[in-house]
């Protein structure tokens, strides 16, 4: 079974993912880390319709530019995959 790795911007509103990696320079990686967006963190997309992407992680809402969100690779989570992982 393959792992579904996509860019954060590809998630639809209401979908969740686990951050897999960030492609970018030290500045971008540091800026995202300061907002709590690091590898292994779970994020949920709140808004993805033009303008910045709005996500939540650990109860905090974060706005991310569309270009930056394309550089964040996530593993998409679905209810079925979560159930399988728990059993």
List PLM regions with ranges.
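Amphipathic, hydrophobic secondary-structure cores in small proteins
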Residues: 13-66
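C-terminal structural segments of small proteins and small subunits
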Residues: 54-87
């Amino acid at each position: 079974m393959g792992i579904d790795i996509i860019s954060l911007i590809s998630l639809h509103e209401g979908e969740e993912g686990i951050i897999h990696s960030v492609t970018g320079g030290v500045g971008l990686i540091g800026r995202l880390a300061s907002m709590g967006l690091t590898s292994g963190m779970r994020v949920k997309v709140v808004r993805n319709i033009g303008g910045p992407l709005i996500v939540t992680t650990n109860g905090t809402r974060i706005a991310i530019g569309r270009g930056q969100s394309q550089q964040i690779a996530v593993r998409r989570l679905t209810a079925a995959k979560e159930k399988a992982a728990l059993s």
